[in-house]
């Protein structure tokens, strides 16, 4: 699994003009699933994301975890497995097929306690980066 994690002041996701997920301060997690991923990778990713110490403490030092006063918005993102080593058109053969990816995306969202986008839908994601702080996590 790959997750692109961004610290945000706010984030939301819309499908067909309707907001399906929205958070205040917290993390936006763009999540991609590979063919070899399973439940263990989803669990490991969720543990890692929720333990990340990417929020400022009282002294302005990045050392606080998510905690109870921040939220997560998780959006499926198969394009994280896009390969552009040959040519200019990305190949997505490194991404899991939807039938394999969707249950793992659902599990990861559940474990993260996240608001979520709609798997497989064309979505509009809006966010306000905080920092910015952006991390790539691979399991």
Model-predicted segments: where are they?
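Glycine/small-residue-rich phosphate/adenosyl-binding loop
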Residues: 78
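Divalent-metal-activated hydrolytic enzyme cores
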Residues: 110-128
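Residue-level signal for inorganic ion chemistry
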Residues: 45, 75, 133
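Compact, glycine-rich, soluble single-domain proteins
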Residues: 19-69, 82-110, 115
């Amino acid at each position: 699994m790959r997750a692109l994690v961004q610290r945000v002041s706010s984030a939301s996701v819309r499908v067909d003009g309707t907001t399906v997920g929205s958070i205040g301060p917290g993390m936006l997690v763009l999540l991609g699933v590979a063919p070899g991923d399973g439940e263990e990778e989803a669990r490991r990713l969720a543990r890692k994301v929720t333990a990340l110490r990417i929020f400022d403490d009282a002294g302005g030092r990045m050392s606080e975890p998510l905690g109870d006063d921040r939220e997560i918005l998780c959006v499926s993102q198969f394009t994280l497995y896009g390969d552009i080593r040959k040519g200019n058109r990305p190949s997505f053969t490194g991404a899991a097929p939807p039938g394999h990816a969707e249950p793992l995306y659902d599990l990861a969202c559940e474990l993260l306690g996240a608001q979520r986008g709609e798997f497989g839908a064309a979505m509009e994601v809006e966010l306000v980066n905080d920092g910015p702080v952006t991390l790539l996590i691979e399991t």
